[in-house]
């Protein structure tokens, strides 16, 4: 007869430098795994195209991010309020943590940048590097966001 009002979703913002790599992976996995718990966005201090190799590798793995777009912090489609801002690159965190336009607790988990792919000498090795990043971010998302209360313990 009466519907119980559900708790509001926790609002997350995933950040990497250009909103082109690991922030999109994290956004995808948290939406897929825990969309009932979280409202998820991603952005960066700068925007670029979402990494083409990432889109291709994720699609080959069965994860479709072809509709994702890169946004900077000032993008008009980016929500304005967040419960947590989650940096996925230490270098970006160190550079902008005090100047971001969002006043929310910050979490840092460093997955590095594309420089980690420099060891790839051909397309097969590049595929494996990106696949490993996707798997690492996916596993981290699975374990990290399962319990929303645990986020409080990760704030830096």
Task: Identify the function of each model-found stretch.
Residues 42, 87, 107-110:
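Structural signal for conserved beta-strand scaffold positions within catalytic alpha/beta enzyme cores
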Residues 24-26, 52, 93-99, 118:
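Short glycine-/acidic-enriched loop or helix-start segments at secondary-structure transitions
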Residues 47-49, 92, 112-115:
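Residue-level detector of flexible, active-site-proximal loop/helix-junction positions
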Residues 1-78:
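Conserved active-site segments centered on acidic
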Residues 78-101:
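Mid-chain, well-packed structural core segment of small domains
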Residues 96-156:
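Phosphate-binding/catalytic loops
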């Amino acid at each position: 007869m009466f519907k119980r009002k559900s708790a509001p979703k926790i609002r997350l913002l995933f950040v990497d430098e250009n909103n082109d790599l690991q922030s999109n992976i994290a956004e995808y996995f948290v939406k897929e795994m825990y969309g009932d718990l979280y409202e998820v966005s991603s952005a960066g201090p700068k925007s670029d195209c979402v990494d083409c190799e990432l889109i291709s590798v994720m699609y080959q793995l069965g994860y479709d991010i072809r509709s994702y777009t890169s946004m900077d912090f000032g993008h008009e489609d980016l929500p304005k309020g967040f419960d947590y801002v989650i940096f996925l690159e230490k270098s970006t965190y160190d550079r902008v943590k005090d100047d971001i336009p969002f006043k929310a607790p910050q979490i840092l988990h460093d997955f590095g940048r594309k420089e980690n792919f420099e060891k790839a000498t051909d397309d097969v090795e590049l595929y494996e590097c990106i696949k490993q990043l996707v798997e690492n971010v996916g596993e981290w998302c699975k374990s990290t966001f399962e319990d929303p209360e645990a986020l409080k313990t990760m704030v830096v």
